[in-house]
Amino acid sequence: MIQSCSGMHYGKVFIGIVILLIPLTTGAFACLRFGPVPVAVSDRAFPFEKRIVRIAVRARINRQTQNLPFAASEDLFESGATIYQHQCSMCHGIPGHDATLFKQMFPAPPQLWKKHGAKGVVGVSDDDPGFSYWVVSNGIRLSGMPSFSHTLSDKERWEVSLLIKNADKQMSPEVVRILNSRELY
């Protein structure tokens, strides 16, 4: 008798879940197919859109983060600055100068030499170099951040990642000169 009651209870719960999922799934599909889904850059974001995406992105990157294969040196910062100036500065700015060309993107590219957030973190200097390396290597879907795995060598991607990890520190005059060597778009 006890088994049949608990079995009936689970059956009702299962049927209730199925009955609930059908209209939710249908509603979600109808909203995506016929509704005003924010797909234009100027549209307001869905509630919690940034938070949901950030959770998924961070989870993936944290599972695949690699360790820095070499120690930091001035030569690496200089070569990282050269690569950054040619490949990254048009979206992410240089020390003291925000990039304006791609500001209308959604999400807007973070300015990697500028303090942000409640803690005043400079760019992504609070991220491990391996985290930034993953982003530089793979890009972020639907954000405008391209993958540089076919454009930059493995070493070059690490050099840029190490440079932006240290964006909150004093850079040598040579690194600053390289970063400021060309006009931003």
Language-model region placement:
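Extracytoplasmic/periplasmic copper-protein system
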Residues: 173-185
